[in-house]
Amino acid sequence: DRIIEFVTANQSGLKEIYLSGGEPTLIKYNLKLLKQIKKRADLIIRVNSNMQWKQDNKIVQEILKFPNVLFTCSIDGTGEKFNYIRRGANWNRTIENVKFLQGQPNVDLRANTVFFVLTAQQLPEIIDYFMEEIGSVDHTINPCGMGQYHLRCRNLSSEIKSLVRENLNNTFEKYKHNLNIAGNLKNCILELDNDGSSVEYKEYFDNIDILQGTDWRKLYPELT
């Protein structure tokens, strides 16, 4: 409450409000804050979201009252691969919400993807879909988190790394004038240049499948 009081008392100097998570559309204090912020055209509301909210979500509805909104969508695959990687999320709902936001004249969209063994091959497709079909203003690619060595793309087979590298180089050439995308892709290519021989990711996903009743090997047969 003290933070909300401080922000609202000093809101005339605000240039941007950044809502992240957890999932910001589920954090009740965000609604309390947003209701007290004037809907100024020179104030950017940035939102990082898993895109699983219902369209009548009160926080989403309050966000949409602002004239300048930027939604960053967490996208680690498409279709069944998205559903597998982002457990509990649903690709169809994601796209429904993306298209809902597309229809809002005050909203810009961008996407964020984690580069790891399960997204490496699909990354160019994901970028193209959001940049060309959705009209994203940008796309960020994050490296695999620390402590997740076994999920890093350096551990892919030489054959797959070669294919991924070729596709990423082509995608780099396509987006070379977008400094953020180009820089992120360069980092992905550098990751592929590292030596890695761990196949622990196979056991990692096998163990998840035992618990969840899923089958990563069916979705990614080339990695098995």
Which residue stretches match the model-derived regions?
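Catalytic cores of alpha/beta
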Residues: 117-133
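Flexible glycine/acidic-rich beta-alpha junction loops that bind and position SAM and/or redox cofactors
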Residues: 117-121, 137-166, 183-185, 192
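Exoplasmic/lumenal beta-rich domain surfaces
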Residues: 1-2, 6, 157
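Radical SAM enzyme core and accessory elements
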Residues: 172-224
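Distinct, well-ordered alpha-helical segments
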Residues: 29-35, 56-63, 122-126
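Alpha-helical packing segments of well-folded alpha/beta enzyme cores
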Residues: 3, 33, 94-97, 101, ...
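Core AdoMet radical
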Residues: 1, 11-28, 38-56, 64-95, ...
